[in-house]
């Protein structure tokens, strides 16, 4: 649930071959579980259209390297969307359309479902089904998908820290160029970086540079 970079990373890891992950710092028990996985389809839900997708280009493009994996789009005709004035958005739309064309076949599948939101989760002792509503049509148009696993990847919100100012509306620590401010005055020796500085934007590399 959600189509940001966390959702892209989850999909990529779940469909990566164990051999491709051996050189990483992934935990051994996680690697063993992936080796035994019988997962065949991943559905990525986004409540808005493709033009509003939260993932970044690099994370989306990496899905193209997954072997034997088809990629599709449901709920948004990405080929008929108007050209976006935002260069990054247009690049993402073009890349997603290209992935759908070039990776239309595979024994496994990643389906991007746009304008879709979960409304109910069902199962006896474990997840078995998810009811999904079309966010444009409302509950008048619902479907039920069989599912055995669900991840919530719907964003991040900062938490207040005792002794420091906090902007409740934005979920960040107010700052001026990373220097924490209170009542428009800089607090000496107090700095902030990353998502708590500017909100949940950017990938790991951009936050490392911020730090």
PLM region spans:
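Glycine-rich adenosine-cofactor-binding loop
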Residues: 1-15, 195-197
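Short, conserved micro-motifs enriched in small and acidic residues
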Residues: 5, 201-208
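Extended, hydrophobic alpha-helical segments in both membrane/secreted and soluble proteins
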Residues: 6-10, 147, 151, 211
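Eukaryotic short linear interaction motifs
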Residues: 8, 52, 159-161, 200
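Dinucleotide-binding/catalytic capping subdomain of oxidoreductase cores
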Residues: 8-135
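Internal hydrophobic alpha-helix adjacent to the cofactor/substrate pocket in enzyme cavities
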Residues: 12, 16-20, 69, 184-193, ...
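Short conserved micro-motifs at the rims of enzyme active sites and ligand-binding pockets
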Residues: 54-56, 124, 162-163, 202-205
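FAD-site-proximal beta/loop scaffold in flavoenzymes
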Residues: 121, 126, 138-198
